[in-house]
Amino acid sequence: MSASQDSRSRDNGPDGMEPEGVIESNWNEIVDSFDDMNLSESLLRGIYAYGFEKPSAIQQRAILPCIKGYDVIAQAQSGTGKTATFAISILQQIELDLKATQALVLAPTRELAQQIQKVVMALGDYMGASCHACIGGTNVRAEVQKLQMEAPHIIVGTPGRVFDMLNRRYLSPKYIKMFVLDEADEMLSRGFKDQIYDIFQKLNSNTQVVLLSATMPSDVLEVTKKFMRDPIRILVKKEELTLEGIRQFYINVEREEWKLDTLCDLYETLTITQAVIFINTRRKVDWLTEKMHARDFTVSAMHGDMDQKERDVIMREFRSGSSRVLITTDLLARGIDVQQVSLVINYDLPTNRENYIHRIGRGGRFGRKGVTINMVTEEDKRTLRDIETFYNTSIEEMPLNVADLI
């Protein structure tokens, strides 16, 4: 939906968007209290019960246009309250008496979809809204039964399973009025682009589209042209994407084979509350986990080759704090809200510099302090400088007293 819906053709892309994703906001209205957003009483109760006191910057700007039904592009870094922004907007617009799916949220990973579902259910706790996670790796027959019997108000899912359910007509698009793409930079990367298009073809042409992302590479902008109408743009400039409260350091390990000893030394010198170690390949996650276990370090590991049940158990243990150190690939870097993480170690620098912000955003959500340590070989030095330039940030050599900072 848009302010001038009828006068707009889908081929005319959003204005104010340059190829490199240097984008201007076109919405300046700020509402700095949840009480002033005209939200329902039961939704407000859920918001305050969840622990929110004051809307974050993105919530102050984006909730209102979302509720008014505009198409919205919202750019904010990890940990700023993006999920609650669209969850609140959806819950305010749901007709509770209509037992039909009215909002569809897509996320790039199963874990993120489940995280979003939890937030929606918690915020909507006093409303009686239903929300179902429609994700791969789960029983299809049980899914079909759930969709047919209940027709949940809100579906949160991954593109493959959602399209399958739409295609087989177990999920009806008839009453879907809001379509949300979370972590759109990842969603619209080549792997998911076609599925997004396919899903969009199934939805009504007047469905409201809300797109959220930490970064706005040109391929995302290209796709927004195809399915967004005169969107409200609420954005932070790239150089503002440095994550406040996160101290960033590097260790010059010189050679790849010296990383393992360096990591073990860190274990002995740091009293870690909880830490995530990022690695670029699934195979290397398994390799490092084995090496750490062989040296009697307790670590858990998670990557995309594991089945869903195993991944769920590992995430549950890590969230509860019973496991303290998690080795993973970028799978976890997309929006998983692990509150206690105070330390992120990039054992490998990310191959895609735009993933850097997703990884280190794990370390200090909503202003919580965090430390990031990047292990850098001679070959990595240029990549590190590239990341510094891209985010307009400074990454210093790790001081000897790093334990005091965590």
Curated annotation (Swiss-Prot):
List residues modified as N6-acetyllysine: 118, 174, 193, 238
| GO aspect biological process, one term | positive regulation of transcription by RNA polymerase II
Motif (DEAD box) positions are 182-185
Coiled coil residues, start to end? none
Q: Which residues carry this modification: Phosphothreonine?
A: 158
Query: Residue limits of the Helicase ATP-binding domain?
Result: 63-234
Cross-referenced InterPro entries, in alphabetical order? DEAD/DEAH_box_helicase_dom, EIF4A_DEADc, Helicase_ATP-bd, Helicase_C-like, P-loop_NTPase, RNA-helicase_DEAD-box_CS, RNA_helicase_DEAD_Q_motif
**Segment Disordered: which positions?**
1-21
Task: Give the sites of the cross-link named Glycyl lysine isopeptide (Lys-Gly) (interchain with G-Cter in SUMO2).
Answer: 146, 225, 238, 309, 369, 381
The answer, when asked if RNA-binding is one of the entry's keywords, is yes
User: CDD domains, alphabetically?
Assistant: DEADc_EIF4AII_EIF4AI_DDX2, SF2_C_DEAD
Q: So what does this thing catalyse?
A: ATP + H2O = ADP + phosphate + H(+)
Q: Where in the cell is it found?
A: Cytoplasm, Perinuclear region; Cell membrane; Cytoplasm, Stress granule
**Which parts of the chain span the membrane according to its record?**
none
Q: Identify the stretch annotated as signal peptide in this record.
A: none
- Domain called Helicase C-terminal: residue spans: 245-406
Q: What is its EC number?
A: 3.6.4.13
User: Where along the chain is ATP bound?
Assistant: 76-83
The terms describing its cellular component in GO are: cytoplasmic stress granule; nuclear stress granule; perinuclear region of cytoplasm; plasma membrane
- UniProt motif Q motif: location: 32-60
Alphabetized, the UniProt keywords read:
Acetylation, ATP-binding, Cell membrane, Cytoplasm, Helicase, Hydrolase, Initiation factor, Isopeptide bond, Membrane, Nucleotide-binding, Phosphoprotein, Protein biosynthesis, RNA-binding, Ubl conjugation
According to its UniProt record, which protein family does this protein belong to? Answer: Belongs to the DEAD box helicase family. eIF4A subfamily.
- What is the name listed in the Swiss-Prot or TrEMBL entry for this protein? Eukaryotic initiation factor 4A-I
Q: Which organism is it from?
A: Pan troglodytes
